[in-house]
Amino acid sequence: MLYPTEFDVIVVGGGHAGTEAALASARMGAKTLLLTHNIETLGQMSCNPSIGGIGKGHLVKEVDALGGAMAAATDEGGIQFRILNSSKGPAVRATRAQADRVLYKQAIRRRLENQPNLWLFQQAVDDLMVEGDRVVGAVTQVGVRFRARAVVLTAGTFLDGKIHVGLNHYTGGRAGDPAAVSLSSRLKELNLPQGRLKTGTPPRIDGRTIDFSKLDEQPGDLDPIPVFSFLGRAEQHPQQLPCWVTHTNERTHDIIRSGLDRSPMYTGVIEGVGPRYCPSIEDKIHRFASKDSHQIFLEPEGLTTNEFYPNGISTSLPFDVQLALVHSMRGLEQAHILRPGYAIEYDYFDPRALKSSLETKAIGGLFFAGQINGTTGYEEAAAQGLLAGINAGRYAQEKDAWCPRRDQAYLGVLVDDLVTRGVSEPYRMFTSRAEYRLSLREDNADMRLTEVGRELGVVDDVRWDAFNRKRDAVSRETERLRTTWVTPKTLPADEATALLGKPIDHEYSLAELLRRPGVSYDGVCGLRGGECGPSEPLAEDELLLAQIKEQIEIGIKYQGYIERQAGEIERNGANENTRLPDGIDYTEVRGLSFEVSQKLNQFRPETIGQASRISGMTPAAISLLMVHLKKRGLGRRKGADSVPGADVQADNTAAQQ
């Protein structure tokens, strides 16, 4: 039957990508339908019970700055919070949290059920409705047809998923859930380029059978306790729990080696490529054969369960080998395994067949997000889902697509890497992937993205008001520090010596003092000489005050580096954002080699910047492209005339940093 209501956007899948996509399009005012095979698994953490980390935490902050749910749900469900790289520079500091699976899932579902313009429906999708070269809806397994202007597909590992434990295997999207076999077959009929990837998960352990007296305790940060969302509060956190650390040993490695003849990875049963940066324990002992041991983190799954997640022993070895390797480690000699580890193979589609909006180039209105694009990780999925949801909503509203640039967000880096370079293995975000990481910090994600999010319609009044208070306070106080001066007469020698190590010998602004190594904002404002402290409190809320102080310190201490990077961004920006016409035939560009023109015609980059990052492209080829565009009056800047926030982001680069 044809469902009587027509929707603007249909989102298929209720994982981290699907939930963010549905919430984003609904926040924009698009009538949105979220189709999931099981409402009870909305927002489920299928693998590790944690959010964030290096690069990943940056993505979560950006999702939050654009009104997404992941950071706020983590604050409500997080049972341990840490700042990684806290002793290093601000560019690589990152938030990571352990989450109670049940509390996190409840927080996501609560937001879905209370979001205006969003409807939920429990049914697996078996087919897409395609008319000509555009999608017009989806068909469920019982034949219900839903029509929509745009469809976002967030299928995770479910597309023709196959689960492996030793040499045994069976179809499944994850343990306990069916695979999407019919939908996978339908997508293959559409002739979209695809392949197979693989990921895995470790066995789960009953905490009552762990000897914690033999393990090293790893507590979270307590002073202060971090929060993930810019609107978060430490008071939202439930009870905090420690993690625990054990290690593999030579006996563990011998047990693993003895089972490789029954490993699906080492016997050719698994064809898909696994994640390089989250390898199975089989891969670890093979790739790092010289290492005598590997750290294993025992992470609690929640407050109301005894289940522990042993981070570091993802495996698809036979269960008897899994049991032996677990028992070989200190503290786990008597451990009971609750669930076996397994590997899962699944279909993905070459992201080079996508536009930067995450819409497929071949089928109008069809968007892909998450593991279907070859990525791995909750955070990468959530970021893509949010972008796909925004652009599906804009597509339904007949507005131009939006995507941040590489110098504006890690989300921009992620998408640009996917659509220009593709993937040969599951893609994971790192800070090292960003050229301008000093400008793309966790602390300034809101300064970079919240204003454009407001224009896109995904930032609500509460977030907007909080952002404006913070931005105004940072601007006002930074200006005060730059224009307030102290002299040897107004700053007593003993105070100067306590702060700087010696008295001052001439006039300094407070900003110049703050720029000195080891000098903090509080230290400068605590000086009695002159008018050093602010005339009024920067914020009544302690968390907001801490965020303001951090922004001020980083902005002043790293001002020279940030300005240098801003200049580099400006110099590279002209060519980077020059659009390439949709219908251009690259074989007609004089001087291009056959190989280069063939690649350009195959991958159809949207901008000169994207073209420059395609494998095999040379500076000479880019110059020929620029000459071709100039001669024919083609190409235009990607930005102000087509999407919200382009003017704002260009004009306020310094303020964002």
Curated annotation (Swiss-Prot):
Q: Give the family, as the similarity comment puts it.
A: Belongs to the MnmG family.
Gene behind this protein: mnmG
Gene3D superfamilies with a match to the protein in the record: FAD/NAD(P)-binding domain, GidA associated domain, C-terminal subdomain, tRNA uridine 5-carboxymethylaminomethyl modification enzyme MnmG/GidA
Q: Which residues bind FAD?
A: G13, G14, G15, H16, A17, G18
Its cofactor is: FAD
- HAMAP family listed in its UniProt record: MnmG_GidA
PROSITE patterns recorded:
GIDA_1 (PS01280), GIDA_2 (PS01281)
Disulfide partners? none
MF-aspect GO terms: flavin adenine dinucleotide binding
- What task does this protein carry out? NAD-binding protein involved in the addition of a carboxymethylaminomethyl (cmnm) group at the wobble position (U34) of certain tRNAs, forming tRNA-cmnm(5)s(2)U34.
Task: Please give the name of this protein.
Answer: tRNA uridine 5-carboxymethylaminomethyl modification enzyme MnmG
Q: Which GO terms describe its cellular component?
A: cytosol
The record's listing under Pfam families reads: GIDA, GIDA_C_1st, SAM_GIDA_C
